[in-house]
Amino acid sequence: MPELPEVETTVRGLARFLQGERITRTVTNRPDMRFPFPDGLGQALTGATVVSLGRRAKYGLIHTDRDQTMIFHLGMSGRWRIDPDETDKHDHLLIETADHRFALCDPRRFGWVDLVGTQALDQWPGFAAMGPEPLGDALTIEHLRAALSGRKQAIKLCLLDQAIVAGLGNIYVCEALWHARIHPRKAGGRVSKQALSLLITAIRDVLEQSIRDGGSSLRDYAQPDGELGYFATRFQVYGRDGQPCHRDDGGTIRRFAQGGRSTWYCPRCQR
């Protein structure tokens, strides 16, 4: 599933060609998406000018001059394609401008879009109870200490809770915990202040590096221009069970099931 860096990379790629442009045509092709396209989507977008693009957690945002925002989620396998040579049967949403064509391609159809008033964006149900952005100033030691106080739940699962930190997913939580040397099963309420400081730094470093690398291309994900992200070449633990820890401390990466997902860690250096 595309996570925060992949969505950020997607938004930046789209912005190069879509920001400031007038939408001349909108086509929706599939009625059987995870959620149906909102009524009136084509009418709302066609003729509108895109004033800016943004991201909140794992959601992409396309803001128009009609004070409306199209929210998109890439689901499990979604990606945007810019000026594709051919139409793909999985291109479920097409947006055209005078010079470019944008296709939202999603083979597994778990992605979706919504249309909301820009001024009411913070009240949209998916955002209303969401925690701070991991790359923003609101993610502080004080915030994490308050959010984790008394929590017996494993720190890995706490970090996946979007009400605690917005936008973190399995890949980058596993990687950040390794960098911070924190065991993923450790109770969130027992992580020390010093360790939380290291964790915040690790989260930001991992996410920022992945954005620079264009994200992690594992299965279906590619950048809008078709290029693959290469952060996967930097994985320290994710998907590396049975391989030696890169700290050369004699540890071997292990995997176990946690909260319905796989968790990877090094039992030697993560305590």
Swiss-Prot record:
Coiled-coil portions: none
Keyword terms: DNA damage, DNA repair, DNA-binding, Glycosidase, Hydrolase, Lyase, Metal-binding, Multifunctional enzyme, Zinc, Zinc-finger
Cofactor: Zn(2+)
InterPro entries (alphabetical): DNA_glyclase/AP_lyase_DNA-bd (IPR015886), Formamido-pyr_DNA_Glyclase (IPR020629), FPG_cat (IPR012319), MutM-like_N-ter (IPR035937), Ribosomal_uS13-like_H2TH (IPR010979), Znf_DNA_glyclase/AP_lyase (IPR000214), Znf_FPG/IleRS (IPR010663)
EC numbers, comma separated: 3.2.2.23, 4.2.99.18
Co-factor: note: Binds 1 zinc ion per subunit.
Source organism, top-level taxon: Bacteria
Reactions catalysed, as given in the entry: Hydrolysis of DNA containing ring-opened 7-methylguanine residues, releasing 2,6-diamino-4-hydroxy-5-(N-methyl)formamidopyrimidine; 2'-deoxyribonucleotide-(2'-deoxyribose 5'-phosphate)-2'-deoxyribonucleotide-DNA = a 3'-end 2'-deoxyribonucleotide-(2,3-dehydro-2,3-deoxyribose 5'-phosphate)-DNA + a 5'-end 5'-phospho-2'-deoxyribonucleoside-DNA + H(+)
SUPFAM superfamilies named in the record: Glucocorticoid receptor-like (DNA-binding domain), N-terminal domain of MutM-like DNA repair proteins, S13-like H2TH domain
BP GO terms, sorted: base-excision repair
PROSITE patterns (UniProt xref): FPG_CAT (PS51068), ZF_FPG_2 (PS51066)
Binding site for DNA: H90, R108, R151
Mapped zinc finger ranges (FPG-type): 236-271
Active-site residues, record numbering mapped to chain: P2, E3, K58, R261
Record GO terms (molecular function): 8-oxo-7,8-dihydroguanine DNA N-glycosylase activity; class I DNA-(apurinic or apyrimidinic site) endonuclease activity; damaged DNA binding; zinc ion binding
CDD domains: EcFpg-like_N
Subunit structure: Monomer.
HAMAP family the UniProt entry points to: Fapy_DNA_glycosyl
Family named by the database record: Belongs to the FPG family.
Entries under NCBIfam families matching the protein: fpg, PRK01103.1
Function: Involved in base excision repair of DNA damaged by oxidation or by mutagenic agents. Acts as a DNA glycosylase that recognizes and removes damaged bases. Has a preference for oxidized purines, such as 7,8-dihydro-8-oxoguanine (8-oxoG). Has AP (apurinic/apyrimidinic) lyase activity and introduces nicks in the DNA strand. Cleaves the DNA backbone by beta-delta elimination to generate a single-strand break at the site of the removed base with both 3'- and 5'-phosphates.
PANTHER family listed in its UniProt record: FORMAMIDOPYRIMIDINE-DNA GLYCOSYLASE
Name of the protein described by the UniProt record: Formamidopyrimidine-DNA glycosylase
